[in-house]
């Protein structure tokens, strides 16, 4: 169904999420996933400390994640406990090829992060340190896939 009018959307800029441990979240995304991070900004006006996790470095059109530290209970945001086959809700991340996916899978294994294959999509999912379900996709048929 077509909207009554259209705007020239360029995609999703960032997703804001909560974490109970910002330092652990930065370590996971930087050291395990190899993403770039901003400096941790101090808490002001009740916002809590916060940090940007860049999915694509040096691209102001796409940041990635904006994590805010709050005293929350750690939960499984991906609902895998209640619905083990669904992995919904989740965030899907895109890699350039299958070789990059293989390298990430090895890094996750080295960090003792369990990976579940989604054979019908040719992707895999895992949970970050906050219990957020992340899916990794890449173009099929590209060298290294």
Segment roles from a protein language model:
Residues 6-9, 32, 85:
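Alpha-helix termination/capping residues and helix-transition junctions
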Residues 1, 72-79, 144:
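A short, acidic/glycine-rich surface segment
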Residues 64-68, 135:
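Conserved beta-strand in the GNAT
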Residues 6, 42-43, 81-82:
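Short consensus segments that form the blades of beta-propeller domains
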Residues 1-8, 11-20, 51-57, 77-145, ...:
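Vicinal oxygen chelate
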Residues 18-63:
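Core segments of cupin and vicinal oxygen chelate
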């Amino acid at each position: 169904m077509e909207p009554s009018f259209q705007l020239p959307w360029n995609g999703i800029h960032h997703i804001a999420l909560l974490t109970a441990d910002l330092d652990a979240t930065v370590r996971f995304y930087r050291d395990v996933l190899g993403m770039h991070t901003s400096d941790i900004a101090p808490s002001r006006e009740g916002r809590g400390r916060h940090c940007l996790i860049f999915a694509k470095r040096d691209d102001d059109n796409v940041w990635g994640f904006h994590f805010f530290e709050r005293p929350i209970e750690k939960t499984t945001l991906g609902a895998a406990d209640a619905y083990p086959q669904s992995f919904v809700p989740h965030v899907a991340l895109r890699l350039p090829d299958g070789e990059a996916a293989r390298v990430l899978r090895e890094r996750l294994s080295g960090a003792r992060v369990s990976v579940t294959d989604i054979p019908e999509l040719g992707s895999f999912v895992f949970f970050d340190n906050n219990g957020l379900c992340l899916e990794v996709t890449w173009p099929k048929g590209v060298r290294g896939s």
